[in-house]
Amino acid sequence: MQTPSSNGFLSSRVNVNYQLNKILTQLIRSIVDFISAPTSNSPLPPYVQIGAAAAVTMGLGYYLSKGANSTGSYSFNGVTYTGNVKPLVDPMNQSRVLPDGSRISAYLKDDNLQAYLFEDAQTLYQGVRRGARLSNNGPMLGRRVKNADGSAPYVWETYNDILERAENVSVAFRELGISVGNSENIGIYAKNRPEWIVTEFATYNYSNVIVPIYETLGSEASVFILNQAEIKIVICDDIAKATGLLKFKEQCPSLKTLVVMEPLTEELKATSSSLGVSVLTFGDLERLGKEATNRPEHIPPTPADLATICYTSGTTGTPKGVMLTHANVIADGVCMDFFKHSGITATDSMISFLPLAHMLERVIESVCFCVGAKVGFYRGDIRVLAEDIKELRPTVVPVVPRVLNRLYDKVMSEVNKSTLKKMLFDFAISYKARDMANFNIRNDGFFDNLVFKKIREGFGGRVRLMITGSAPLSTNVLTFVRAAMGCVVVEGYGQTECVAACTVSMEGDSLAGHVGMVIPSAQIKLVDVPELNYYAKDNAGEVCVKGHIIFKGYYKNEQQTAETIDSEGWLHTGDIGRWTPEGTLKIVDRKKHIFKLSQGEYVAPEKIENIYVRSKYVAQSFVHGESLKTCLIAIVVPDVEVLVPAMEEMGIKGTFEELCRNEKVKKAVLDDMLAVGKKAGLFSFEQVRDIFLSSEQFSVENDLLTPTLKSKRPKLKTHYATQLNEMYAKLP
């Protein structure tokens, strides 16, 4: 006799639900088709047919989905959650207040911060070797290789393969005169690919320090980095980068060797020879190490040793070298301890496309390597990233808001073409939001198959964990992504000076609009900012961070270090935060880049830009103001996929460039921005008075964005100086 809790009963129930799902999905697809073209033979008017069919659709969907997959019962202070994800802590009390007013994660059992995930992985050197053991020398790094038949599957190298290559490269560094120890910096100037990781772990074998050079730092910044870090050797991925560095050899006396990951040209050989720089391929470098007879014992780094100097291109001024130790990077990976339901294991695969010079990417990869997971690289071309993701079918996806915003805009532009689709889509989102509020994360329900399946399949159909950060993500976009993906989607907040993240949202927490709770390796306090009327007594102020994740200072720059880390060890981020009633952090403003208008009002342009990006027409914006002016203006890059069809419906046709020059189009965009701003609670002085529509996107390539996709405000001001001056000249 079977009981309701027996496996046989559950198996039967799952099978019945699956069959019902299949039948009803087909039924409702037929209803959707019917609504798109209601029959003229019916005695009922078309709108009645549509309403009845829509009601049947939603009713059946609700009935089938009701209560499905709710497998737990977890109570906190009288509130019960019945989803399949157990809340890590009480969702209504996610942080604990210490006597000094600072906060730590409620996940911690005492007041001691957590320094690492695993006892046997306290450095990155130890971490990858732990992964090799746990995976039993499983696949580690993959790249797509094109076959004769045109297919391009991922081809994998094992942990031992990569460690052997790293061994040879590290020995080759010795052959080329690179000293052992933390005083020697190795430069790398390349897109994400296996050789990047090989170089990184080769660097750690003898406690050297890896210094990434961003692709678009510009020549002046690159020269500064090479000289300040006294870099002797740079690993480049292509001829163009190597050639670019050689142009400035006379300004970089320390540069002695260039290694290129592709075949050398005769021109490059001749140029490098004339400048006294050795040049060889990455294959040559590996062979040099493999054939070397002198193979000294490794000098593994300690947790306190530097792992990397990560130069922040910054939105202003000269690059600053953020010194991060092995302990720092390992401690930031502790945030992954939050994920008990969706934690990374040896069976996981991650897609790597965010720049490896970006610490968010490196932290997540370091955790993958600690547990024996595998990482597949995109082909270096963002235009075919979707194809790479579909081929890899990753389970872990780090992503930036810009990618998710584009996905949302694309889906919504399609959904808005049909009243029925919009009704069904909104209902599905609402239902899923209710389900998620109960900590129920699923992708096998009725609406998952009917409405969201294509979106999931666009990411390969296997994603379990999606991590986003680096910029704010609007509430509606985050809720959409969580509903559509049917997996754990978390948002983090931080900066390079605290490695990557100092807060991360709890898995299963569906409440959007915050950036999560303090990670276990950090503590946070809010400090008064009286000029902006933010006070700690009101649970608001500048976000200050302390703990194992705080950087050791700016390389060879004690003055800026002292300006950023106070005497008690608190990192002052320049961001304004507010504690929510649930004990999570919400970023509400920016202390940096604030300016005062002529009437004395302070303005935080980044806050305004983050609101305007919610306008359906806006892809990017740059809000500008001056101390001698009374109002704000903005440069706006419209979303081409939304603007063109929307204007056609209004009877305005033309190319994207032509539309950007059309005054009627400008008015439509400005009106929508002002409506969004008003709804978000912007004061009148925070609303822009005029805009210029630019058909040129802000990008890393045109030097208007940092590699972490933040606006370079001085560059934008210079780039659009003519348009800004003209707008102010026309205003009364």
Residue ranges of model-derived segments:
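Conserved AMP-binding/adenylation subdomain of ANL enzymes
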Residues: 330-352, 356-449, 462, 484
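Conserved AMP-binding A3 loop
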Residues: 156-160, 307-333
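Conserved AMP-binding/adenylate-forming core of the ANL superfamily
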Residues: 116-119, 137-201, 218-223, 281-283
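Gly/Ser/Thr-rich phosphate-binding loop
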Residues: 78, 277-282, 395-398, 408-511
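Conserved pre-ATP/AMP-binding loop-to-beta segment of ANL
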Residues: 136-139, 278-280, 287-311, 318, ...
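Conserved ATP-binding/catalytic segment of the ANL
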Residues: 529-538, 542-597
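ANL superfamily adenylate-forming
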Residues: 65-76, 151, 240-303, 411-454
